[in-house]
Each structure stands twice: as C-alpha cells, then as structure tokens.
C-alpha cells in the first residue's frame, strides 16, 4: 500500500516538472559559434509589425557584416487587441549604433533565409546610442519583400497584367512601319529637330510650369470662394436666361447707337478737325499767359476786391468794418439831386464818393483832380 502511494507521488511530481518545461527544438537554443554571445555582448529589443518567416538564431548584420543574432521572438498584444513581434537581438560589444537606428528584415538568399539588418537613420540625424536594454520602436522598423512575394507579384503581372496586349502593340507597330521605311527615316531627323527646339525652350517651359504652379496655388487658396462662385453660377445663368430678350434688345440698341455715332462722326469730322485747329490759338494764348492767368485766379475768391485788401480788413474769423453815414440834408441833396450825369455843371458821383484807401489806392479827397493816385506823394490824398 505504501509503495502505491509512493509511486503516485513520484508520478505527480514528474508530471508537474515536465509541464513547467518547454522544448521548441534545437533552433530554440543558442547555437555555438553565433555572434552576440561573447564577453561584453548586449541585448536590444526590436518592435516589428511583420517578421515574415524569421527564425531564432538568424544573423543580425550591419553593412553586410554579421554582428549578432536573433535571441528570441515573442508576440505582444497591444491594448487595442492587435499584435506585434518583440524581437530580441544579441549584439557584439563593438556594435556602435545610434538610439534611433532602423531595423529591417531582409532576404539573405533566394532560398528564403532571412536576417535582421541594422543601420543608422538616413532621413534624420542620429541621436543617442544603443545600449543593453534599448528598444527600437515599430516606427523605425520595416521589411523587404520576400522571394515568394516577388514571384507572386510577377505571376499576377504575367497572368492578369494584360501582357498579351504587348504582342498586339508590336504587330500594329510593324504594320505601321512596313513599307514606310522612307517616311520613318525622315521622321527621325524631324523628331531630333523637335527635341532640340524643346531643349532650347526648356527654360520657358519651366517658367510656364512655375506660373501654372502659382496659379494652382492661388486657386487652391481660394477654393472656398471658387466653390461658392460655382454654387451661385446656376442662379446667375438662370437670371441671364430669363432676361435674354432684354439683353438682346440692349445689344440691338447699342448697335443702333453705334451706327448713329458713326454717321455723326463721319458727317462732322471735317468741322471737328477745323474746331480743333481753331482751338489751338486759344490754348496757345492760355499757355503764353499761364503765369498771369494763375495769378488772376486769386481774385476769384475776393472779387470785386483785391485779396491784399481783404487780408488787411479780415483778421482771423471776423471782418472789421468802419462805416460813416452822413444823413444831413446837404449831403443827401448833393448826392441825389446834384449829380445828374448829363448836367455838366453838377458834380458827378465819382467826384463826391471817396472809396477806402485799402481798396483802390489813395483816391480819398481827390474830387475833381485829374491826377494819377499812384504818383501822388504820400499824405496828400488824406489831406495831411
């Protein structure tokens, strides 16, 4: 009875021990002589979306030189449920690569053997350095097409790529050339001439393409406005269609106006030319007296008074006027009853009135005197 219990215990322990062990074949064990296992070797992990048929112990190469080996491949699940392969690489101690190095699964031979290729990045500057425990993210990994994928794509092209049409193209080309060798011989120099002409105008063609590019950029920036314009275009066309009779009438009226204008110009062109000739003398006179004409324009704002008198009378925003009214009977009688123009014995109005000095010069108190006011000595006119 004791032997039975002892056998059961031994069998249970053996089963538990064997259940905790796993053996994946000889390739799951580190093979002797592979790189990346010597003194100073270190390990890095590469995240790859697709490793194809990459096995463990595959070589790791830098510039076609083996510097390590694949130590293991583990499938890791992302939070969204997708998977990626975490490839552990053992590298020799003399491998110096930046931390942002790129890793690719490459084809070693046409027989299907694969290896992992490590290299510095080419699209950005290298940073940092790979050390033990570093990780190369999935963004820095890639895979070259395998031999099977290349032959599969080639089979698709051959079978379903319409390669058979190539025979028809060759046959049609032969029929076009057969019997017309002379024309095609002359065609070659013409093509050479055309090519030379295009070569001479290559800068103009480039400028035209640049201009087209700028126009395209402008249209791209205003695509919203163009879209709105195209949306409103049907309504505009509809309005034009509704008013097409009025538009036709307007153009017909414009035609009649053009005919009348043409007739008037034809009948009056001689007179119009003579008028222009006669206008030359007027324009010439204005040009000759342009300085005096411009100076005379100053009098328009103060007519009939000269501007220098206005400047003396007007100070600021106010006009100072001093007026003396003589309403005596003697002055009224002399003014209204003794100034008949046709009576030579009566004094005239210009002999009685004395305008201000600042308006017409020193003429005050010069009644009846035949003298030039500008030649009278100062003080004489005012009675001094």
From Swiss-Prot:
Keywords, ordered alphabetically: Cell membrane, Lipoprotein, Membrane, Palmitate, Signal, Virulence
One GO CC term, this protein: peptidoglycan-based cell wall
InterPro entries: Mce (IPR005693), Mce/MlaD (IPR003399), MlaD_Phospholipid_Transporter (IPR052336)
Lipidation (N-palmitoyl cysteine): 21
Any coiled-coil regions, as ranges: none
One GO MF term: phospholipid transfer activity
Membrane topology: Lipid-anchor
One of the Pfam families matching this protein, by short name: MlaD
Signal peptide region: 1-20
An individual GO BP term: intermembrane phospholipid transfer
Superkingdom per UniProt: Bacteria
Locations listed in the record: Cell membrane
Function of the protein: Stimulates the host (mouse) immune response; lipidated protein produced in E.coli stimulates T-cell proliferation in mice previously sensitized with LprN. Spleenocytes from these mice produce increased amounts of TNF-alpha and IFN-gamma, as well as somewhat increased nitric oxide levels, upon subsequent challenge with LprN. Previously sensitized mice infected with M.tuberculosis have an exacerbated disease response, suggesting this lipoprotein may down-regulate the host's immune response.
NCBIfam families the record matches: Mtu_fam_mce
Protein name: Lipoprotein LprN
Record gene name: lprN
């Amino acid at each position: 009875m004791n032997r039975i219990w002892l056998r059961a215990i031994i069998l249970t322990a053996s089963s538990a021990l064997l259940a905790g062990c796993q053996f994946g074949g000889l390739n799951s064990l580190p093979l002797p002589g592979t790189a990346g296992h010597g003194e100073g070797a270190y390990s890095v992990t590469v995240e790859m979306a697709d490793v194809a048929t990459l096995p463990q112990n595959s070589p790791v190469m830098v510039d076609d030189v083996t510097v390590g080996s694949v130590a293991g491949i583990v499938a890791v699940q992302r939070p969204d449920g997708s998977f990626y392969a975490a490839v552990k690489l053992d590298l020799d101690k003399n491998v110096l690569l930046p931390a942002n190095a790129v890793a690719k699964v490459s084809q070693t031979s046409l027989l299907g053997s694969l290896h992992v290729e490590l290299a510095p990045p080419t699209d950005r500057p290298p940073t940092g350095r790979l050390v033990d425990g570093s990780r190369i993210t999935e963004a820095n990994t890639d895979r070259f097409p395998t031999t099977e994928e290349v032959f599969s794509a080639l089979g698709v092209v051959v079978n379903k790529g319409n390669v058979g049409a190539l025979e028809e193209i060759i046959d049609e080309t032969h029929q076009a050339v057969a019997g017309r060798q002379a024309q095609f011989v002359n065609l070659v120099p013409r093509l050479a001439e055309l090519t030379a002409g295009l070569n001479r105008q290559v800068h103009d063609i480039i400028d035209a393409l640049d201009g087209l590019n700028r126009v395209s950029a402008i249209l791209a920036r205003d695509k919203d406005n163009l879209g709105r314009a195209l949306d409103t275009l049907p309504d505009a066309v509809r309005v034009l269609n509704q008013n097409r009779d009025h538009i036709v009438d307007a153009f017909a009226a414009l035609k009649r106006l053009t005919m009348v204008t043409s007739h008037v110009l034809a009948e009056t062109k001689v007179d119009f030319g003579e008028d222009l000739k006669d206008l030359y003398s007027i324009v010439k006179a204005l040009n000759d007296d342009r300085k005096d004409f411009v100076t005379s324009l100053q009098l328009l704002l103060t007519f009939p008074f000269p501007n220098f008198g206005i400047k003396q009378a007007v100070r600021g925003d106010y006009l100072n006027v001093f007026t003396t009214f003589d309403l005596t009977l003697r002055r009224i009688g002399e003014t209204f009853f003794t100034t008949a123009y046709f009576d030579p014995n009566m004094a005239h109005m210009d002999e009685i009135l004395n305008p201000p000095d600042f308006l017409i010069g020193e003429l005050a108190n010069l009644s009846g005197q035949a003298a030039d006011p500008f030649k009278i000595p100062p003080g004489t006119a005012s009675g001094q």
